[in-house]
Amino acid sequence: WKRREKPVMEPHLAWEKITVMCPHVLWEDELQCYRMWYSAGRMHEADAIGIAVSKDGITWEKDADNPIFTPNPEKYWEIGKVEACFVCPKRNGWYHMFYLGMDGDLIACVGLARSRDGKTDWQRHPSNPIIAGFDGSWDWSGICKASVLETENGYMLWYNGCNRRFEEIGLAVHDGFDLGFPKEGEEGVDERGDGTGLGGVNYYVRDCIARY
């Protein structure tokens, strides 16, 4: 590996404050360019998500409409920040974005949203957060920084989980490719059940697989 002497992206816009971080890059055949979804804002934990494009992966053009994804003030679980997204390649006309949301106490959960073009009209999952800790769990204070792999049977999602003492790597598994979004034009139903992160839509098998 040969590192470049200077960063390929720096914060220079008002919303970016002092930080650009958590890059997630896809090569887009239709656009014939790289697209980067990135987080920006304060140090350590960013505030919102932006997008940029590049032909060579070095020189990036930030979108004039950034940030493209910001906290929803009507949803307490993500009222503080949204950041550290993982965007799956387009499938059946949709980009699916797994993202970190933080509440007013900076407790982190994983949410899911989708968009036709990967930039505009993001539709949040009606049962967000789709993966959340609960009192007494090994990952109660934070589930974040998802990394997602599509398999023959559905999805595997690895994440950072923490409980203010340890930070560990967890795994969530989803059977099938129907992620539970409502049909277009419908509002959908919140299926979170008892609010523990283990009911209804949270049909993920969660487990700790590594400690570091």
PLM regions with names:
Residues 1-212:
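Carbohydrate-active catalytic/glycan-binding domains of CAZyme proteins
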